[in-house]
A protein has these predicted regions:
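Long, internal scaffold/assembly segments composed of regular secondary structure
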Residues: 250-251, 255-343
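Short catalytic helix/loop segments, enriched in acidic residues and glycine
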Residues: 44-59
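C-terminal catalytic subdomain
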Residues: 319-443
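Extended hydrophobic packing segments that form well-structured cores
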Residues: 394-518
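Short, well-structured alpha-helical segments in soluble
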Residues: 79-92, 109-111, 279-288
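Structural motif
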Residues: 71-85, 175-177
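Cap/lid and interdomain-hinge subdomains that line or gate substrate/regulatory clefts
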Residues: 64-66, 123, 127-263
Length: 518
């Protein structure tokens, strides 16, 4: 499946400069099921109704991508041909199916054996209300999604086909919103196989949770994870011209608040210029080698003058994934989430985060989320400062970094872990809050959250599941979307949310071990 999905990417939208600024140019095919038993008049109504539904969905303003009507699926040959055309169309990101009439499900077997695009089963019907006074057998034959969709869903279940099922009336906002939400998951499924992670350094020595099977990750997710000597990318940094550095530094100084904290302005600016040079050198190297995510490690900086900080933050803001201390799984997940939220209106941001320290005051419990330097400014709330302070990690010059407070609101924290013979995705709902008091001596960007259902249950279940201290965090996706992505990838997903109970969670972990293989 991964191999065929690789054809689906619309290359031009993600390889031009500043590659997350353009809306992905994908479409979703609407395939209505019927059969020729009912005659031409009925089939003409089926086609007309399907076109009307597609037009309504596209005009709703709720869908992030266009829906494309396809001729009615009435035979095995038509279904098989259409699905293979979907496989080979690089603009098709998924298929939406609906049975207007009864559609014998054996006709769908060969097509679904060959379909390699994400699938949503929209269980709806053309008419909202039963026409009590006029309904006759002709109407019954023509409008029997309640019948046809059950037949269709049966064969999908028998074949073990992963799909999203959406139930409701096609004009209702909640149905359109569910379809829109699934579209973003489908983009994640399709685009996953285009994620390439550049490792500028190996895993932090003796750390367990950031390790993982890169071959299995490519088999499961399509991710390519490659290592480059740090001094090779350092050469790309050194090759950046001073004039280019000056232009970018000027941009920094116009965009961010400069916080000298007693440092000499010229000396401060030189430290900032090092990060500008790193940003330009890293980005050019990533573009040249066609990578969309990067990992670094403070223990392996080679000829780099500073630990990349502001530079990495800016790259994440542009859409690149990042993981610290060699954490390629987080880098890939951050990239994935940024793809899934591309073009989202009022997006609040996505970033790598790390659990740092707790507040254990009763009624005020929470976790400070930060890192030494590298938090994405898309999650910032209010002014962003550039600060330059000493950092013992890395034994290099004082690195410049962006410092800010994060937005409040609901988000999800995810941790993809390698359990030895399989992957598990842990998904936790969190409530992001403002810190109670300022942190004047902490020169990092921060987030502060309380995990659901409460600090104690949320933390205990995270530990039971084996969750990492690094997370891929976003305000803009839901646990359902990420769980659907995990299901499409064939891996376990565990949820920690407002309804989580310790006893039930332990049972879910035990059942997951049995199902996915302990």
């Amino acid at each position: 499946m991964i191999g065929l999905l690789r054809k689906s990417r619309v290359e031009k939208d993600l390889t031009e400069g500043n590659f997350m600024k353009t809306q992905l140019n994908y479409k979703f095919w609407f395939c209505t099921g019927s059969q020729d038993l009912y005659g031409d008049e009925c089939l003409s109504h089926v086609a007309a109704h399907s076109k009307e539904i597609v037009e309504c969905l596209n005009k709703s303003g709720k869908l992030p991508f266009e829906v494309v009507w396809k001729p009615t699926m009435i035979t095995n040959e038509v279904i098989r041909r259409t699905f293979n055309e979907a496989n080979n169309d690089p603009t098709c990101a998924g298929v939406i199916t609906w049975m207007h009439t009864f559609s014998p499900a054996k006709s769908w077997i060969l097509g679904h054996q060959e379909l390699r695009k994400p699938l949503a089963h929209l269980h709806t019907q053309y008419n909202r209300e039963i026409p009590y006074e006029t309904m006759d057998m002709d109407f019954m034959n023509e409008n029997q999604a309640a019948h046809g969709d059950r037949e269709y869903a049966h064969i999908l279940s028998r074949m073990g086909i992963e799909r999203k099922t959406i139930v409701g009336y096609w004009q209702d906002a909640e149905v359109q919103e569910k379809l829109a939400s699934w579209m973003r998951t489908a983009i994640g499924i399709v685009e996953s196989s285009h994620i390439r992670v550049m490792r500028v350094a190996d895993n932090m020595r003796n750390v367990a949770v950031t390790e993982g099977d890169k071959v299995e990750a490519q088999l499961k997710f399509g991710w390519e994870v490659d290592a480059y000597p740090v001094n090779e990318i350092a050469e790309a940094v050194d090759a950046v011209s001073q004039s280019d550095v000056n232009v970018l530094v000027d941009e920094y100084y116009s965009k961010y608040d400069i916080c000298l904290e007693g440092r000499d302005p010229e000396e401060f600016k030189k430290h900032v210029a090092v990060q500008a040079q790193i940003e330009l050198g890293f980005e050019r190297f990533l573009e040249e080698k066609n990578y969309q995510a990067i990992v670094t490690h403070f223990g392996d900086l080679g000829a780099l003058k500073q630990l990349p900080g502001l530079a990495i933050q800016r790259l994440m803001e542009k859409g690149y994934g990042f993981g610290a201390e060699g954490d390629w799984k987080v880098a890939a997940m951050v990239r994935l989430m940024k793809i899934m939220t591309t073009g989202m209106k009022d997006a609040k941001g996505t970033s790598m985060l790390e659990d740092y320290t707790y507040n254990l005051v009763k009624g005020k419990e929470g976790i400070i989320q930060a890192h030494m330097l590298e938090i994405c400014p898309t999650i910032s709330d209010g002014p962003i400062q550039i600060k330059c302070q000493p950092l013992s990690m890395g034994d290099r010059e004082d690195p410049a970094r962006l410092v800010f407070q994060s937005k409040t609101g609901k988000g999800i924290a995810t941790s993809l872990i390698d359990l030895g013979n399989r992957f598990r995705l842990i998904i936790q709902d969190v409530d992001c809050k403002k810190v109670e008091k300022p942190l004047p001596k902490l020169p990092t960007a921060i987030n502060f959250w309380t995990p659901q259902p409460d600090f104690y249950t949320g933390t205990e279940t995270w530990l039971l599941a084996g969750g990492a201290h690094h997370t891929a965090f976003t305000y803009d996706l839901t646990a359902e979307q990420m769980g659907d992505w995990a299901a499409a990838m064939g891996i376990e997903a565990v949820y920690i949310d407002k309804d989580t109970k310790i006893r039930d969670f332990k049972r879910d972990l035990a059942l997951g071990s049995l199902f996915y293989g302990k």
